[in-house]
């Protein structure tokens, strides 16, 4: 649901999600030059891609220092800083080409030196985003994001033409509830198995990706408790929530249950999630429905 809503609205978060996923995939495939380009493009969409860059650099350096003797650390370390330091910065600056070539860009004329204007622009953006504390009726603490405690209403009207005296039309930036509620449990399970693998010193690539995605996409927001933030930011780590669900489904399929039973349970779960998505589709797409039908979809009072 959340991805669908983003795909129909003019926000940068979906483009950010695409390039971040591409970067993480390429990084996982050891295609580091391409990953550096992809994460640079992601940073060109929104600065929050930096958290994924930091996570990938941290893991890459950990692997280098744990696998190479001290005499062989210099070359691979320098290479990683070029791939995930110099290259993303160059790509990010290149993404500003239109601004540099135009005389009408925001703050472009702040200084006769275009680079000074660019730095000033960044200073203003940083000040705005770190100092944004104005109250908003749909702001939501990151603690509530996983369970869709306070989804963001992008649009609401009470039009006519639904066959009833009272009609409603809303675009609610909310994930499919049952998917996210189950995903919350799945993420907790995945983290538990990841910690067990860490203690046993075994490598679990799937779990590593899930934890990296959740740590980089979700965890940083908890450090902005006074800032005005919204649930729809969660789209960046939704793919990793789904990966956690897939991981748990695989655990079930590989369990001691008879294959027919485990497959039936997984199929039933997927079916329920699909039906839940269809049920909420009208408020994902802004369909005109009766007020009573809209109210039936407000399972929590905090969704109103």
PLM regions: where:
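Short acidic/glycine- and proline-prone juxtamembrane loop motifs at membrane-interface regions
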Residues: 2-13
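Specific aromatic-rich, kink-prone transmembrane helix
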Residues: 15-39, 241-244
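Membrane-interface alpha helices of multi-pass inner-membrane proteins
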Residues: 26, 33-53, 57, 218
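Hydrophobic transmembrane alpha-helices of multi-pass, membrane-embedded glycosylation machinery
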Residues: 41, 53-64, 236-239
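Transmembrane helical bundles and short interhelical boundary loops of multi-pass, membrane-embedded
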Residues: 58-65, 74-84, 88-92, 97-111, ...
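Membrane-interface helix-loop-helix junctions at transmembrane boundaries of multi-pass membrane enzymes
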Residues: 67-82, 189-212, 260-261
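Membrane-interface anchor segments at the N-terminal boundary of transmembrane helices
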Residues: 149-207
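Transmembrane-helix signature of polytopic, lipid-linked glycan biosynthesis machinery
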Residues: 214-229
């Amino acid at each position: 649901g959340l991805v669908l809503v983003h795909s129909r609205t003019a926000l940068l978060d979906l483009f950010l999600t695409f390039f971040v996923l591409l970067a993480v995939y390429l990084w996982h495939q050891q295609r580091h030059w391409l990953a550096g380009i992809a994460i640079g493009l992601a940073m060109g969409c929104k600065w929050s891609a930096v958290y994924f860059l930091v996570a990938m650099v941290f893991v890459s350096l950990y692997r280098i220092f744990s696998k190479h003797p001290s005499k062989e650390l210099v070359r691979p370390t320098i290479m990683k800083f070029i791939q995930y330091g110099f290259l993303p910065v160059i790509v990010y600056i290149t993404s500003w080409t239109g601004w540099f070539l135009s005389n009408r860009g925001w703050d472009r004329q702040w200084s006769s030196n275009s680079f000074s204007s660019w730095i000033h622009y960044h200073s203003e953006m940083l000040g705005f985003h770190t100092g944004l504390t104005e109250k908003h009726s749909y702001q939501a603490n990151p603690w509530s994001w996983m369970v869709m405690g306070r989804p963001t209403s992008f649009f609401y009207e009470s039009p006519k033409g639904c066959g009833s005296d009272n009609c409603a039309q809303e675009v609610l930036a909310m994930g499919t509830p049952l998917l996210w509620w189950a995903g919350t449990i799945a993420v907790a399970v995945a983290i538990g198995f990841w910690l067990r693998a860490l203690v046993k010193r075994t490598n679990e690539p799937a779990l590593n990706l899930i934890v990296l995605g959740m740590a980089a996409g979700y965890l940083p927001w908890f450090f902005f408790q006074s800032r005005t933030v919204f649930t729809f930011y969660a789209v960046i780590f939704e793919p990793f929530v789904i990966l956690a669900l897939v991981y748990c489904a695989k655990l079930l399929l590989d369990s001691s249950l008879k294959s027919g039973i485990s497959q039936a349970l997984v199929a039933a779960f997927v079916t329920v999630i699909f039906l839940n998505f269809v049920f909420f589709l009208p408020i994902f797409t802004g369909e005109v429905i009766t007020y009573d039908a809209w109210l039936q979809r407000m399972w929590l009072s905090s969704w109103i």
